[in-house]
Curated annotation (Swiss-Prot):
Positions bearing Phosphoserine: 81, 89
Name of the gene this protein is made from: E1
Keyword line: ATP-binding, DNA replication, DNA-binding, Early protein, Helicase, Host nucleus, Hydrolase, Isomerase, Isopeptide bond, Nucleotide-binding, Phosphoprotein, Ubl conjugation
Enzyme Commission numbers on file: 5.6.2.4
Family affiliation: Belongs to the papillomaviridae E1 protein family.
Domain spans labelled SF3 helicase: 406-556
Protein's name according to its UniProt entry: Replication protein E1
Comp. bias (Polar residues): 593-606
One GO molecular-function entry: ATP binding
GO CC, alphabetical: host cell nucleus
Amino acid sequence: MADPKGSTSKEGLGDWCILEADCSDLENDFEQLFEQDADSDVSDLLDNGELEQGNSLELFHQQECKQSEEQLQILKRKYLSPKAVAQLSPRLELMSLSPQQKSKRRLFAEQDSGLELSLNNEAEDNAPEVEVPALDSGPVDEGGTGDVDIDYLALLRSSNRKATLMAKFKDAFGVGFNELTRQFKSYKTCCNHRVLAVYAVHDDLFESSKQLLQQHCDYIWVRGIAAMTLYLLCFKAGKNRGTVHKLLTSMLNVQEQQILSEPPKLRNTAAALFWYKGGMGSGAFTYGKYPDWIAQQTVLGHQNAEASTFDFSVMVQWAFDNNHVDEADIAYQYARLAPEDSNAVAWLAHNSQAKFVRDCAAMVRFYKNLQMREMSMSEWIYTRINEVEGEGHWSSIVKFLGYQGVNFIMFLAALKNFLHAVPKQNCILIHGPPNSGKSSFAMSLIKVLKGRVLSFVNSRSQFWLQPLGECKIALIDDVTDPCWLYMDTYLRNGLDGHFVSLDCKYKAPVQTKFLPLLLTSNINVHEETNYRYLHSRIKGFEFPNPFPMKSDNTPQFELTDQSWKSFFERLWTQLELSDQEEEEEGEHGETQRAFQCSARSANEHI
């Protein structure tokens, strides 16, 4: 019979297995087995003495602290992990509404490898923190309404409060908050107009604010949509951001972090239309009339039609009527007129403002110069003293002349010939020692008559006498020997009252007569033989006494415009000045019409 498959009989090879399988006759119990193992040839291998506790408690304490720290890190990573978004998507980690500052302390301890890295609490975390708000609908507190508390909690959980408020504002009103406002970085900058977006205001406080704000504002625009409330407030007085926030937080019972506050855009037509159209709807509450910056950009009228074109002649007429001759004065005063004058608004909007100012000043000077030349000295004095406001007394001038020992009758006669420019009598010299009031007396007369002062320091220029053709009276103060020599050499003909050739800048020399010239000097020219040819051409008066002062260091004699006004009015007849009431009437008894230099007709409707 064949052998079973898979088995092979090999005799003679299995004896060793039988021998190894024989059981040993040695049967020992466990105690004998341990006793035999304990026997050793090495002495003192085992220490059978009593054991001490050692540092096992400290080791156990360290193990417990390590385990607690690991559990705490697990809880932090579970509930407040700033890297949860980073683990989901690297792109989502980089998305942020505002830049995040680096944390100063570590929220999560690093894996300690024996270098005690976990103890370094002030190391900076280079990874940006992205906080994930959990907007779950939890139970609301019992102290307030559910909707307000949910909105407020959503605001608190957001990482960027301002961006969240702006997003909710745009969702509610359909326009961005920055599109209606301009940015004020400082909290101390005052402004009369404010745009405020307040989040989560109670309905009762919202309604009451419409009445409470009326005592603080001239204009109120209020509208509430969902949890967002929008205010446009035009305060009666300028307020800074901190003051406005303090007012709203106390009135609406909200926190400052629920408020966005910026001034409105005043020159943006789209923003003005937003307030204008929003105020016409039923959902908005308004109080007061529209502010000027809204009305000018939305309300159509004849002012808007005229403001688009600038009339240069109107500007010249305004400067002429108000006696504005200086370029800086014209520019500043006409700019201040813009809120009231449409032509000034058009001038401000023009690109050639400086050119118009220069041309306006030049035209006014042309008109004023010719007007002055056509006036007699009587008309000029009458015009100038009528511009002086207030009342004075002419006796102050008479008393001062008496104090200086001047014969008033002789002075009055010399002044009469001086004002009428009588040949060889149209120059008066006031001489005397220093600090005797010579310059104060002469300057007060020049000031009230709008004269010009000549300075000999400019005598090296051939145009230093040009102001003589632009005034009715002139003064050379503190004449010294070089000036006397110049006058003796070149100005004899002018002092005689004859025509002279006067060189003017940017124009050909003009033919003119010397106007009344007043001089002050420490030198009595009548005692100088070197200038004997000037003796008959100059009338001199001496002021020998020092100018008197009161105990409070004010002049004892008031030489003011009001004093000279009273002086001329009192001595008008003695000075042989003409009656101005008769000169103001024409040949047929008609009053003279005021000068008009504008292009608008006199009969045109205003």
